[in-house]
């Protein structure tokens, strides 16, 4: 199981860093920050599928 620590999130703004992650919703997130913000928004239902684009 691949996991990302989102305990420091949500954050009000994310950098434009390009390190894509693929979520369990089959959506590509540009970086950990945007992914973790989405995880918080989903109340923890969103998980990491894998690193890289979906």
UniProtKB/Swiss-Prot annotation:
GO molecular function: serine-type endopeptidase inhibitor activity
Subcellular location: Secreted
Disulfide bonds: 6-36, 14-33, 22-54
List of glycosylated residues: 43
Site residues (Reactive bond 3), renumbered to this chain: 16-17
Major localisation: secreted
CDD domains: KAZAL_FS
GO CC annotations, alphabetized: extracellular region
Domain Kazal-like: 4-54
Keywords: Disulfide bond, Glycoprotein, Protease inhibitor, Repeat, Secreted, Serine protease inhibitor
Domain writeup: Avian ovomucoid consists of three homologous, tandem Kazal family inhibitory domains.
The name this protein goes by in its record: Ovomucoid
């Amino acid at each position: 199981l691949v996991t990302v620590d989102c305990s420091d999130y949500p954050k009000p703004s994310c950098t434009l860093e390009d390190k894509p992650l693929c979520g369990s919703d089959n959506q590509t997130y540009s970086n950990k920050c945007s992914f973790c913000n989405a995880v918080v928004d989903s109340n923890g239902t969103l998980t990491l599928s894998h690193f890289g684009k979906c």
